[in-house]
């Protein structure tokens, strides 16, 4: 919190009221895309994390980010699914057997820590 150059960031998973309202009024697959439509802007960065790479809510979020002029990066597991294809060149993929959620989640956690330290070292 004492950093001279803080990084603006937010989690689209944290607002349970928004998630519930969007899922109820539209559908669950739109919970992130609709938030991005309101909050995202050109030049922003979207990072999505998925074991399978096939979650409709994340695929729609990447589509919305593209419409808004945002860049999308993904962390995927198993075979990477559709997210790996949508974010070619902007994907960190952990190849694991399908169903090995623990391995993927642990690897993604470690990768997120590395990314955080890289951002801190630049700022």
Where would I find each of the regions flagged by the language model?
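Glycine-rich phosphate-binding loops that contact phosphosugars or nucleotide phosphates
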Residues: 1-123
